[in-house]
Amino acid sequence: MRKNSGSESLIVRSGSSGMRWVMISFAFVATVLNYLHRLSFTYLTANGYLRGIIPDDTFGYIASAFFIAYMISNAFSGFVIDKLGTRIGYSLSMAFWTTAGILHALALTPFQFGFFRFMLGIGEAGNWPSAIKLISEWFPSNERSTASGIFNSGASVGAVVAPPLIAWLGTTYGWQLTFVVIGVLGYLWLAIFWFTYYTPKKVIKEAKARIIPPLKLLKNRFVSGLTLSKIFMDPVWYFITFWIGRYLADVYGWNLAKIGWFAMLPFIVADFGNILGGLFTQWIIKKGVPIPKARKIAVGIFGLTMALPLLLGPFVINGPIGALIVLAIAGFGYTAYSANTMAFPADVVPKSATASVWGIASVGAGLGGVIFQSISGVAIKNLSTNFDYEIAYSAVFIGYGFMALIGLSILLFLTGPVVRDKELQEYVDQD
C-alpha cells in the first residue's frame, strides 16, 4: 500500500502535473464527440423523413442493436486497451466509431441504420475504458473522482451541443451531411491525440504488467457487483439521452427546431453533476472521511437524486418545462453518481487492469441497454396505442425510477468494502 501511495504522489510532484490536465481534456473532447455520434440518430429520427421510416418500436430495436454491439465490445475492449496501451487503444476506438458514424449517411433502410448503429456501438465502447485508464495513469487516488467527472462531463456537454447543432445541420444541409460533418471532427481529434499523448514514465512498467484474465477479475466481489449494478443503472441515462427527442415530439408535438433548443436544458444541468459529484467527494475526503466511505456516501446521495424524480415526476409534471426539470434533476443525479463509480476501479485493482474492469462492468451496461431499450420501444408503442403518449411515457419513467433504486442498492449493499485486491496485485507483480 505504501508503494502504491508513493507512486501516485509522484504524479502530482513530477513535471507532468500540468500536463495531466491536457491529457484529461483529450478524454473530455472524445466523450463529447462520442455523444454527438450517438445522439445524431436520436434527433434526426424524432420527426421528418427518418421518423416516417423508423417508428417507435423499430427505433427501440435499432437502439438495442447499438447496445448489443456495445456489450460485445466491452467484453474485450478493456483488455485490448490494457494490452495495447492508452494511446493506441484510444486511437483505434475513435477511428472505428468515427468511420461507422460517417457511414450512416449511406443508410436508406431501418436494417442498414441498425447495422451501422451496431458498428458504432463496437467502436464507442472503447471510450470509457480508455479514459479510465488515462486517469489511472495521470491522477492520484484522491483526485480521480474529479478527473472522472471532468472527462465524463463530455457526455453531458455532447448532449447539450447535440440538439441545436444537429437540428441546425439537419434542417440546413440534410441528415446525410450531418453524419459526415460530425465524423470529420472525430478525425481531427484523432490526428492531434496521436501526436500528443504519452504515458508517464513512472507508470509504463506497471502498464506493461501481466494482464489479468476476465474471470479472475470477476471473482472480485466489487467488480462483479459493479457489473450487476450497471445492468439497471446505466439504461436510465440511456433512456433520457436516446428518447428525450421523441418524448418531446410525441407528448408535446414539438418539431426538430424546437427540440433542438430545449432538449439541451437537462444536459446542461447534468453537466454540473459531473463536476460537483467529484468535488463533493474530494471535499468530504479533505474533511477526514476515508476515500472508500466517501465514494459510497456520494453514490448513495446522488443515486437517490437520480431515482426519485423519475418515480415522482409523472404525478407532478403538468407541461414540457416540468418534464424537462424532472429529467434535468435525474440526469444531474446520474452524472454525479457516475463521477464516483468511475473512480472505483483504480481503488480496487492494479492500474494495469483498470480499463479491463471498466470494460467488464460496461458489459452490464450494454446488456441493460439491449434489454430495456427494446422494452421501452414496445411499451411506448403499445401503451400509446391503447391509451396515449403521456400515459405511455409516465409508465416508462416510473419503471426506470425503480431500476435506479435496484442498481443503487446492489452497489451499496452487495459489493462489499472498497479495498485493493492483494491477490490481484500479487498476480501482476509476478515475473
State where each predicted segment sits.
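Juxtamembrane intracellular "pre-TM" segments in multi-pass secondary transporters
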Residues: S7-S16, P200-T227, V251-W254, D431
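Cytoplasmic helix-loop-helix junction between adjacent transmembrane helices
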Residues: F116-A155
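Extracytoplasmic
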Residues: V22-D56, I240-G245
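Extracytoplasmic gate region of multi-pass secondary transporters
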Residues: F41-Y43, R221-G277, S338-M342, F372-Q373, ...
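C-terminal ends and interior cores of transmembrane alpha-helices
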Residues: A95-L108, G300-N318
